[in-house]
Amino acid sequence: MEFAAFADRAEAIESESADTAITEAVTDLFRASGSDLSTLARFVQGRVFPAYESRTLDIGPRLCYEAIARAAGQNVSADDVEQRLADLGEIGAVAASYDLGGQQGLAAFGAGGGGDDALTVAELDDELRNLAAVDGSGSQGTKVDILFGLFSRCSSTEAGYLARLVLSEMRIGVGEGTVRDAAAAAFDVPVEAVERAVQVSNDYGMVAEVARDEGESGLATVTLEIGRPVQAMLAQAGTVAGALEDWDRAAVEWKYDGARVQVHFDGEDARLFSRNMEEVTDPLPEVVETVESTLDAPAILDGEVVAVDDGGDPLPFQEVLRRFRRKHDVAAAREDVAVRLHAFDCLHAAGEDLLDAALETRHDRLESLFPADSDVFSQMWLSDDAEEIESLEAEALAAGQEGIMLKDPTAAYSPGKRGKHWRKRKPDVETLDCVVTGAEWGEGRRANVLGSFELSVRTDDGYATVGNVATGITDEELDDLTERFEPYIRSEDGRDVVLDPAVVFEVGYEEIQASQSYASGYALRFPRFLSVREDKTPDSADSLARVERLAESQ
């Protein structure tokens, strides 16, 4: 398929407002996709790579502006593009506003494609993968060259959607649910079969191809693959009384103040993945050593990595993140902050997928993988007694942990799902994970430092504001945050700064109030900064629907 045809279809999809019409349009796209089906299943969501891959284009907004400016002609600069973005508000509209095709870049296709033929979806996919592979000295210039060549071959409509795709800002109303339903409709297979295959593979493109080529029977053969992470099962807040009322008895585990990790062991080598499915094997060598020296057969485990002091007592969550972020001099970091794995679930063991097994069964398999005296697997207690559970909670808190997890012992493991089968009980006030979409420069001696941050939550078509936070951030943290946000500055107007959504804050608050001052219709009363959620992306931040539920439950 030519990229122009995809861009036209994306434009048509974006013009629809009804979910059914959007799904029908994506269904038609899939039926017409031919050999490009896998790629289009990603592109239509604004993804270049499958969700389980940690690869990125590593293209900041400024590099994209430079490529657009070069393709637009000698009289256009990156600053001009940025100013037009401030006027138009969206990078796709900016790219589409220039006449990019036919500029002097047509002679430069050695870096960005091939000749004056129409750009195809397959060729664009190849070029973007080449761009992602560029590394080392001069890599930014090479990336701009590749983008320049691609933009120079684009019509206005194509350029708009290319810019959105490159900056992960497609936002045409197509989410994972739409792709799931469209794949099922396009190839006449049950939605449940598609969803199940996606749960175990985390690859919508591959699943769509299997649905088309092999049907429902083929989807049933899609299984977990060691080395290919899946989304983590998530918990909602809950109470002991509610859990016992729903399940009669509960599985109780300590809730560790750590970072989620998925362990993949192929029988020889271990690989570790964060909650966002980014590989974190290299920063955590002691966890790798523990797994490789203990396990005998292939396995996929779910767990938490906790930072500990010399006595083995837990350290704050931020200490774990220091290790997760460390890319260089890992040995020194290991000396400064030790980490320990607490595995609490088993998704696969010795060739057998266990997602559909009951939690109680999965935990038995988990224990069987380790020596009886091992402290690697997390203890689990079964109880139907509220007082006993509260006693276990007190023990967890006394040991420096966050609280307890309450789980339905009969429930299967549902990747990516936040539901009633796992419930977290913490004494802390509920927090929100908000996307930072704006900021404000300080005043006086802090004029060159960002001092206040605009908080937003996810909606179906973007983000909606819920407030601003400045409380709880030290001067040192403000300096660090300013440096962190600089690559994501989209535009500035006086002290006001518009930021590309890239960073997630964990925010505490006293109350959620109805408010017309913010786009969400809600405002956080007395918000306070708690931490940067290094383990989360904007796609996994809290949603407006959750804000609504929390507001109703106050």
From Swiss-Prot:
ATP binds at residues 253, 260, 275, 304, 344, 418, 424. It catalyses: ATP + (deoxyribonucleotide)n-3'-hydroxyl + 5'-phospho-(deoxyribonucleotide)m = (deoxyribonucleotide)n+m + AMP + diphosphate. The keyword DNA-binding does not apply. The active site is at residue 255. Signal peptide: none annotated. One of its GO terms (biological process) is lagging strand elongation. SUPFAM superfamilies: ATP-dependent DNA ligase DNA-binding domain (SSF117018), DNA ligase/mRNA capping enzyme, catalytic domain (SSF56091), Nucleic acid-binding proteins (SSF50249). Its cofactor is Mg(2+). InterPro entries: ATP-dep_DNA_ligase, DNA_ligae_ATP-dep_bac/arc, DNA_ligase_ATP-dep, DNA_ligase_ATP-dep_C, DNA_ligase_ATP-dep_cent, DNA_ligase_ATP-dep_CS, DNA_ligase_ATP-dep_N, DNA_ligase_N_sf. The keyword Magnesium applies. One of its GO terms (molecular function) is metal ion binding. CDD domains: Adenylation_DNA_ligase_Arch_LigB, OBF_DNA_ligase_Arch_LigB. Keywords: ATP-binding, Cell cycle, Cell division, DNA damage, DNA recombination, DNA repair, DNA replication, Ligase, Magnesium, Metal-binding, Nucleotide-binding. PANTHER family: DNA LIGASE (PTHR45674:SF7), DNA LIGASE 1/3 FAMILY MEMBER (PTHR45674). Belongs to the ATP-dependent DNA ligase family. DNA ligase that seals nicks in double-stranded DNA during DNA replication, DNA recombination and DNA repair. This is DNA ligase. It comes from Haloarcula marismortui (strain ATCC 43049 / DSM 3752 / JCM 8966 / VKM B-1809).
